[in-house]
């Protein structure tokens, strides 16, 4: 976890916590968090992907922690007078540091939220759950669903199925892996690339590909399907499972 040690002259000088600061009036919490990380730690924010937001409401003002992960190692170093040093700290070692009181009070909730969530979508099953004429043009129907999921990936979700052991996060930004099979594999992806959406075109059985992903994908996994046999295979692999209705209600 990337942490900064505050300069001695600042509030709680010498304490450790995540980079951050005040949000400008025109900024979202995401823009503010990434800007502060860049200004204080020289972090290349183009290399990280946001996966959640956790709020701490103090009645009159709110502290929001934006959670993000980097798919590859990235460098960071102190570039602000407010920062004495920065370090990548193993999660198990965080509690041993002298932490900023606000961060220390949130650490248990933050630690539970560090693991990103991947939603694995059985597109054939979801597509078959809504009667929009998909049987006349499977590739076209798959394209419509992909476009809608891309929007959802960008806006995030505020509710997860009860089957997911979720932390107290205000908004999740999962990774989506959408599995296509058969005629649906001809569907084109969204016109605008979305870093949280990946299309997996199954070479063989779509169910086999979904079960493989459920077992091999790191972090929390949520499989969206109503297929009983596939649900059992995914649950046996350690993934959570929900039916298509959860996803369709969000689109």
Task: Tell me the role of every PLM-derived stretch.
Residues 116, 121, 127-251:
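Nuclease catalytic cores that cleave nucleic-acid phosphodiester bonds
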């Amino acid at each position: 976890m990337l942490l900064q040690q505050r300069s001695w002259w600042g509030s709680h000088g010498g304490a450790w916590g995540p980079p951050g600061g005040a949000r400008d009036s025109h900024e979202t919490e995401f823009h503010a968090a990434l800007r502060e990380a860049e200004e204080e730690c020289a972090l290349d924010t183009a290399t990280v992907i946001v996966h959640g937001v956790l709020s701490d409401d103090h009645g009159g003002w709110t502290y929001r922690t934006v959670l993000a992960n980097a798919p590859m190692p990235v460098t960071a170093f102190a570039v602000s007078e407010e920062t004495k040093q920065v370090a990548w700290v193993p999660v198990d070692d965080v509690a041993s540091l002298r932490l900023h009181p606000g961060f220390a009070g949130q650490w248990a909730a933050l630690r539970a939220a560090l693991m990103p969530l991947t939603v694995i979508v059985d597109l054939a099953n979801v597509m078959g759950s809504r009667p929009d004429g998909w049987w006349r043009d499977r590739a076209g129907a798959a394209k419509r669903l992909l476009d809608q999921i891309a929007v959802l990936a960008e806006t995030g979700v505020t509710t997860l199925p009860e089957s997911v052991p979720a932390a107290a996060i205000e908004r999740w930004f999962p990774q989506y892996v959408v599995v296509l099979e058969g005629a649906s594999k001809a569907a084109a992806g969204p016109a605008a690339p979305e870093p949280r959406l990946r299309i997996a075109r199954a070479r063989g059985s779509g169910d086999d590909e979904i079960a493989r992903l459920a077992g091999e994908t790191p972090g929390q996994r949520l499989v969206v399907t109503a297929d009983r046999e596939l649900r059992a295979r995914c649950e046996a692999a350690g993934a959570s499972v929900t039916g298509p209705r959860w996803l369709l209600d969000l689109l």
